[in-house]
Each structure stands twice: as structure tokens, then as C-alpha cells.
């Protein structure tokens, strides 16, 4: 496993630029499309909502708890480099959320057209997260869990994302109407495929080693 000093020295401005760009795209899409059109999610976000509905656990407790579990697994299987890169991405993501919230909506309200919202939202999430993962980082517990699943199973990244999303969305049918879940399936399918495509651009298919995610030249 790399030392902390080595990891910091390898963290280039180019890598930082791409992490910032990825978090900007991701947060822009979630703020201007997902939140306005009320598109529900799979993965950790969906599990937080599920736990809140059936167990009464507040999101303020469930979300950090689930993220901690996912990142603990990521540290074990993906290493310190991944954790530090994910921390940079998380700070950048929070900053961009704050930035977008200070402006009025920048895209038309797609609430009357949920299919369009699901497709476009999936594009923003897929490209944004794909860029972040390509730099060896994570935007949240969802990405960390998907990368660990890929590490352990050898699945393609898209399949790992879809697996976690479909399990949670399937369980969410216990309290969310099927029509709403259907649009969520559209957005998670689009985003999963795009994450896999963007993350793999210019690279042969690889599995992350124990000490890091992918390194960018």
C-alpha cells in the first residue's frame, strides 16, 4: 500500500481539475433535475429513504452510517489513495451544491415530463460520476460500494451499480408507486452505463488493486 506522502505527491493538478469538473456536473444535474422533478434513487440514497420510511431512522443518522460502512469496505479493498481522493471529491461536491443553491434554476422544470427528466438526469449523473471514478475517487457511498463489488466479483462497473440500485429500488416498491420506480429505473440504467463508459475511456478493462483505484497519467 502506498504511503500517505507518496499519495499526496502523486495528486496532480490535472487530477484535481477533473475531480472538480466531475463534481460540478454531478451536482448541477442533481440540483436542477433530480431534486426539482423528484426522481428517486437507488443505492445508498434510496436505502436511506427506505430505512426512514419503515424503521423511522432519520436521514441525518442513516446517511452517514451507511456511507461510513461503504467507505470502511473501500479502505479495506481499495486503499488509502481511494479514500483521500473520495474526500477531495466530497468537499468539492458540497461546495458546488452550495454554489448552485445560490442561483435560481438554470434548466427548465421537467416535472411534467418525467421520462425526459429521468434520461437527462441520468446523463448528468453518469458523466459526472464517471469522471470522478476515472480519477480513482467517489462521490459517495454508492460509488465506493459499487467499486468494492467490482473488485470482489470482477463485474463491469455498470453491472455493479445496477445491482445495488435494482436491489434497493425493488425493496422501495413496498412504499413507492411502481410508476415512479419505473422512471428511477430509467435514470439509474442510463447513469450506470455512462459511468462505466466514461470511466473506461482510453483504458483497457482493469480491476482496481488493493492500494488504489485507477491512476491517471
Where are these regions (language model features)?
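Core subunits and conserved enzymes of cellular information-processing
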Residues: 2-217
